[in-house]
């Protein structure tokens, strides 16, 4: 084995089964995931989920910890896992490489996807109207938006919207971009700019790490346009309260999918349906379950509305940047 796929997590039936999974072994399920929780609390965090699923399905359910998202795909392909909870790119790879079936999508803040936001400190150039204030509910704070991307009192963050305004970016524009592996900070923005006729290689790229630093760069005058998740300004309000008005959101890219849950292709259909239903209902099953789900994988829910086309589109963008 070229690398260690899983980290051991001790008790609570969290050992890795090295035997190949198959349709005849549906009396036991192994779930691979990359949890938010680290260290000694890991077994405690996984236990309630695996115990709940065992009770709902009537089969033994084990949880194993993958070293990273790519390792969840390796585990599924190697027959070391039946179910993976992973990010959108790994879902796409599992579907393409191992014919995995997508059964659930991750829900964060009530949504299965999010847009990359184009921010600016120069609304005179990028806004066709006066910026308006709309409430970003997750932070219970009003933020500035323009170009009609938020017509209501409460922001929704739904894209695409006003992407044509990216065409105002010229070769002398300082554009703040994050790592080339960042969907919201680089990949989707670059595709959107290129579709609007912007030669990204010609702009003055300002590299930063993290969505917080992307919007802070605008607040500090280090760039004119920046990209980040919706709404990155909320992450720096305490250190820079004026960022809610000084940095304006002026466009949304197409939606970027959250991750989800996929299963091996030969899983018994009845068990697969029961698994999807049980996981879909988990967050609502108890207050403890909701807390465990947030602490374990940073989610508020799962949903059976898989919107597979968003995952496939994400795969296209990944392939574009792998050339």
PLM regions with names:
Residues 35, 115-127, 256-270:
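A bilobed periplasmic-binding-protein/Venus flytrap-type ligand-binding module shared by bacterial periplasmic
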């Amino acid at each position: 084995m070229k690398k260690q796929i899983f980290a051991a997590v001790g008790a609570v039936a969290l050992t890795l089964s090295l035997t190949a999974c198959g349709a005849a072994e549906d009396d036991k399920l192994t779930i691979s995931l990359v949890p938010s929780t680290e260290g000694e609390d890991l077994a405690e965090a996984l236990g309630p989920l695996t115990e709940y699923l065992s009770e709902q399905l009537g089969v033994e359910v084990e949880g194993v910890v993958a070293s990273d998202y790519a390792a969840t795909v390796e585990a599924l392909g190697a027959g070391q896992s039946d179910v993976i909870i992973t990010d959108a790119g790994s879902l796409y790879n599992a579907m393409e490489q191992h014919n995995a079936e997508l059964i659930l999508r991750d829900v964060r803040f009530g949504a299965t996807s999010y847009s990359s936001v184009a921010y600016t400190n120069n609304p005179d150039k990028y806004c066709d109207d006066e910026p308006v204030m709309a409430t970003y509910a997750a932070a219970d704070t009003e933020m500035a938006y323009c170009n009609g991307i938020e017509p209501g009192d409460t922001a929704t963050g739904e894209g695409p919207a006003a992407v044509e305004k990216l065409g105002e970016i010229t070769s002398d524009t300082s554009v703040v971009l994050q790592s080339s592996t960042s969907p919201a900070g680089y990949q989707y923005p670059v595709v959107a700019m290129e579709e609007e006729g912007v030669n990204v290689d010609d702009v003055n790229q300002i590299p930063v790490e993290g969505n917080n630093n992307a919007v802070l760069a605008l607040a500090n005058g280090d760039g004119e346009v920046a990209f980040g998740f919706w709404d990155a300004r909320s992450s720096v309000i305490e250190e820079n309260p004026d960022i809610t008005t000084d940095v304006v959101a002026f466009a949304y890219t197409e939606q970027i999918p959250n991750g989800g849950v996929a299963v091996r292709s030969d899983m018994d259909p009845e068990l697969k349906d029961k698994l999807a239903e049980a996981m879909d209902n988990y967050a609502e099953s108890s207050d403890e379950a909701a807390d465990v789900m947030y602490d374990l994988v940073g989610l508020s829910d799962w949903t059976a509305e898989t919107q597979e086309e968003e995952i496939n589109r994400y795969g296209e963008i990944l392939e574009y940047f792998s050339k």
